[in-house]
Amino acid sequence: MPANVSFEEVAPGTEGSHYALAMIRKAQIRSGQDVLVNGATGAIGSAAVQLLKSLGATVTATCPPDHPELVRKLGADRVIDISAEDFTKDKQTYDLVLDAVGKSSFARCRRLLKPGGCYVSSELGPRAQNPLLALITPLLRRRMVLFPIPRHDQEMIRHLSALIGSGEFTPLIDRRYPLDRITEAYRYVESGHKIGNVVIVVRPPD
């Protein structure tokens, strides 16, 4: 664990971020490439924006109308307000569309992809189609779906830990709850209003 970061701050660094890192690595994103992150205020999306910027990618990110400044602080080069604009009708094209909330689909996002571009989602997609599309679309070699399965391996944890220690990645924490309020924490998460991560703080007995 980085010496300059508390356990509460680093604990969320291996949750949404390991999904985001698996997606980014599977897409083989390089410096200078263009990426759209749908859902940049969630645990996965907020990590994805920061991890992509650490690689030198140019990031467009979507968010609700009350969080554009937060998303810019995460590093997004451009922010799309989902209440004012349908991101799937964006004029720009991308090397990767990373759907961090799993609320869109390859069919809707396909037009956003450059030739050879990738769509990756945190969810199975409509009718659980994403794993199947991940098998079929690479054969067409134009625009494809990826469906990486993240693993908690030591190399990934060390990599994320190093980024946290250097300040290139800071897990976004919305709220902290003590263990005896864990039910309240779950209710808040299920409300759909959280941003980033919710941390349960376990204190040693007196």
Labelled PLM ranges:
Residues 1-206:
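Terminal helix/beta-alpha structural elements that buttress the NAD(P)+-binding lobe
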